[in-house]
Amino acid sequence: MKINGNEIRPGNVIEHQGSLWVAIKCNAVKPGKGGAFNQVEMKNLIDGTKFNERFRAAETVERVRLEQKDFTFLYQQGDALIFMDSQSYEQLELQKDFVGERAAFLQEGMTVTVELYQEKPIGISLPDQVSVTIAEADPALKGQTVTASYKPAILENGIRILVPPFINAGEHVIVDTNELVYLRRANDKG
């Protein structure tokens, strides 16, 4: 669908210069001289590079609609991650580097959302929060309760995060998969 350059909003996926880009930031600029334009910071969906572009109001760009499908993670085979389409039961194989460091959070049976463009996967979304076990954590030092302090810990999947001093090895915690940060203990209600 064609849209004007001044209609681009954050989160829109557009086709520009032969690639797919997602708009991150948009700033409408009205200079004293000349016509108004939309300053757009974009990220390439294929290789992750960032790019700034000015779009005049009269310019048109192709806005792309991505298909989103739910897949269930089945297993890992070497560097390949095997997923199953929840509707058609077809299997999809993605390379581990396609998912990035968040691949360590994949668990058997976990539902993920894969973004497809012309039947080709271009992005994957894991659940925002997952429960994992702390494999190693330094013991808490006395007197560390006055200020908000954190200590390093290693999760069962090998990811390093910072946790509060009261968290010990063997405890289950909730981790934000986007920011890779500790949120709370897994048995907490909040």
From Swiss-Prot:
CDD domains annotated for this entry?
S1_EF-P_repeat_1, S1_EF-P_repeat_2
Task: Name its cellular compartments.
Answer: Cytoplasm
| GO cellular component terms, semicolon-separated | cytoplasm
Which keywords fit this entry according to its UniProt record?
Answer: Cytoplasm, Elongation factor, Protein biosynthesis
Pfam family of the protein (one) = Elong-fact-P_C
One Gene Ontology MF term: translation elongation factor activity
What does the record give as its pathway? Protein biosynthesis; polypeptide chain elongation
Q: What family does this chain come from, according to its entry?
A: Belongs to the elongation factor P family.
Q: What is this protein called?
A: Elongation factor P
Organism of this sequence: Bartonella quintana (strain Toulouse)
Q: What is the lineage of its organism?
A: Bacteria, Pseudomonadati, Pseudomonadota, Alphaproteobacteria, Hyphomicrobiales
Gene label: efp
